[in-house]
Amino acid sequence: MVNDVFIQGFTAALIAGLITGVGGFMIFLKKKYSREYINVMLNIAAGIMLAASFFSLLSPSLEGILRFVPDRHVAGYWFVGALFSGVVLVWLLNALLPHEHNSAGHHGPNISLRSCWLFIIAISIHKLPEGLAVGVAYSGDELYNPLSLVVGIALQNIPEGLTVAISLVGAGYSRLKAALYASCTGLVQPIGALIGISIMEMNEKIVPIGMALAGGTLLFVIINEILPETYNTKKSQKSAAAVFLGFAVMAYLSIVLE
């Protein structure tokens, strides 16, 4: 029988995933978006996810581990081990489903269809651990705050949806098809949520470990996938300010939604 945790976690991840479509349909608002504009939006999204990782996953994870493992040294080993396990998980996903980074190309008018779809696969791959994080967060008790995490992921999905739509238009798709395909990339997140909940339902002691693992996956995605593609070294202050703005907004929301 499906319990409330499955329903809530799946629904939350589905809503956050569908928000990707908001970004996708933004392709109709302007004839052309500059690369700088998209990069600033993605830098803000990276800051949002950094804050969501710390405030909604890593911090409560450490508190949860300390409840079950009083020895702080041992708790630290568990926490760091789970964190790096999340990194390994994403690395394995990337290795099993190879893709290429495609920052410059997805703004051009004549990108190759192969490059376009490899870029979309990359976006979809990293939405799986985001959904996993939502599922893990909903599996916890009152110590955890899944709402702020869901809001953070939803906000991040908007510029990503727009980026995918721009990539598809550049490959020759109509704006409507581009927006619809961009929306579909978010549907990976509820699948990840169901996986996360299923694993966490086995034992409540696994939940804080799972939170740290999920935090590791998100941090690696941000550091390895998003920032290298969008951080402008020629305008580093603007890029840094955008990341900090996103972090500050999410930090505020984490406090308000607590």
Listing of model-derived features with the role each one plays in the protein:
Residues 1-258:
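Intrinsically disordered, metal-sensing/regulatory segments
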